[in-house]
Every structure is written in C-alpha cells, then in structure tokens.
C-alpha cells in the first residue's frame, strides 16, 4: 500500500488538504482519494449572486472510494462511492489524482459471476452529476437494482441457443415534484407538470432469446 498527502493554499479560497491511499492484498485492491477545504473564502467575486461566490463560508470537499475483489475465480465484486459537497467543486479546484472524470461521481455495488454457460450480474448504481446549478432535467438515474442473466449453449452440429435478460428499476430524484406530477421552483414559485417520460421512475425488463446455426469452415 502507499499514501500521498497533498496540502494546497488556494488564493481567494483558503487552505485545502488532500490525500490518496491505495492498497493491494491477495485478489483485492482499492483506493480512496479526497480533499477538504474548511470555510471557503468565496473566491475573488464580491457579488453574492455570482457562482464563484456561491459557497462563501461553506466547507468544500470530495471523496472517491473504489474497491475490487474476488471471492472465487468465477465470482467477483466491486464497490465505488463518490460524493462531493457541491456540483461546482471540480470547476473551482480540479482533481489532484489519477482519476480524471470530473463530470460525474459514481456510486456502485456490483456482484458478477462468469460461468461456462451462465453470466450473472447484480448491481446498484448511481451518480452525482457535477454541475452547478443543476437543472432538474439533468438529474441522473439510479439503477436500484439492475439484474442481468445471460447464457449460451453450443451444440457440436453448429446450432446454438442464447438467452439475454435484464431487469432494472430506474429511480430519479426530482426534488419538488408532488404526487400530482407538478414541480415547483423554490426560488420563483413557478409550477409545471412533470411528464411521465421525464420522471421515468419504474421497472424495465428486457428478454432476448435467440437460436442460430453457425457453419464450420
């Protein structure tokens, strides 16, 4: 394992302390990285309506943890959790370590089985979108959960059968939407109806059986 500590003094914001810790043992490996800046000085703008000044006096931070491991040669798992204090964090401070994705922070729990016939995957997955301000229409969907089962059978005469299937519950956090489908903007008080395809919370099932024949050369 190894660790890195990174202190930074950022003009118009303050003192930030960041770090990364990586480890490897057996068939498991992972890392955690993050930074913390207490009591942000608010940037160089004195306009309280300027996005640069939106977080004056607030603690700014992010954390990103990932882990991958195996129970057996066929059964593996992965976990990831990323979060930030606000959607503008990377615009203001960037990202210090190896991961360069600054548009989303992923949350994931996954268990996968790779067999000779069946491949199975179960996961819960979501994202924090790093935009500020974040439009309600741009809020990402969570998969809670997503279950996949795929299989293939091959015969000596060239015939084969396949089964591909997935069932996923999609969930989207639309703040301010009431039970009648109306969304109210807290700042302006304006209301509008949320279309079903826009909310789109619900279960999706995909089943794809197939049969075929492949000629041997």
Question: Where are the predicted features?
Answer:
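Outer-membrane beta-barrel proteins and related beta-barrel translocases across Gram-negative bacteria
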Residues: 1-217
């Amino acid at each position: 394992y190894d660790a890195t500590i990174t202190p930074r003094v950022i003009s118009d914001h303050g003192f930030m302390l960041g770090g990364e810790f990586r480890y490897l043992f057996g068939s498991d490996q992972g890392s955690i990285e993050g930074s913390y800046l207490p009591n942000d000085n608010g940037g160089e703008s004195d306009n309280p309506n300027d996005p640069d000044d939106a977080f004056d006096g607030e603690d700014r931070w992010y954390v990103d943890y990932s882990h991958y491991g195996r129970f057996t040669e066929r059964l593996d798992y992965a976990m990831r959790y990323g979060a930030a204090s606000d959607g503008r964090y990377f615009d203001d401070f960037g990202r210090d370590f190896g991961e360069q994705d600054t548009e989303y922070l992923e949350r994931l729990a996954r268990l996968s089985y790779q067999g000779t016939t069946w491949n199975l995957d179960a996961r819960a997955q979501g994202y924090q979108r790093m935009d500020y301000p974040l439009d309600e229409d741009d809020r990402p969907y969570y998969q809670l959960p997503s279950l996949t089962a795929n299989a293939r059978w091959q015969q000596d005469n060239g015939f084969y059968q396949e089964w591909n299937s997935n069932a996923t519950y999609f969930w989207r956090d639309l703040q301010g939407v009431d039970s009648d489908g109306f969304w109210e903007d807290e700042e302006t008080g304006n209301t509008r109806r949320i279309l079903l395809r826009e909310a789109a919370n619900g279960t999706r099932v995909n089943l794809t059986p197939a049969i075929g024949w492949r000629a041997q050369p």
